[in-house]
Swiss-Prot record:
Record keyword Membrane present: yes
Protein name: ATP synthase subunit H, mitochondrial
Biased composition range(s): Acidic residues: 93-108
Subcellular location: Mitochondrion inner membrane
Family as reported in the entry's similarity comment: Belongs to the ATPase h subunit family.
Gene designation per UniProt: ATP14
């Protein structure tokens, strides 16, 4: 009967309980920590009294008087590509802006 018990004990694998010393020391210190009691007087020097901010000044717009605004409204509008005189050079073809120069002497 003794041999049967010895054989049954050896059939089970056992793991060694490993201790994590750092984790245990940390949890022990956290549990032992007692926070100091604070009163309202302790916070007086640490907190500034609240005061409402001052109202912001409105922005100043350049040329806000009526004469400057009227002059701006009456100013001619510049449009790109528009010519002022009839004697100007004829308008370029739309495809001229992307013209590739043909290379000479290239054999295909």
């Amino acid at each position: 009967m003794f041999t049967l018990r010895a054989a049954s004990r050896r059939a089970f694998s056992t793991s060694i309980a490993r201790r994590n010393l750092i984790s245990e020391a940390y949890t022990r210190e956290v549990r032992a920590f007692k926070a100091p009691k604070l009163s309202a007087k302790d916070a007086e020097g640490q907190v500034k009294p609240w005061s409402a901010p001052s109202a912001p000044k409105p922005p100043v717009v350049e040329g806000a008087d009526a004469a400057e605004l009227q002059a701006y409204a009456e100013a001619p509008v510049d449009v790109e590509g528009q010519t002022n005189s009839k004697s100007a050079s004829p308008q370029a073809n739309d495809e001229d802006w992307l013209a590739f120069e043909e290379e000479e002497g290239v054999a295909v």
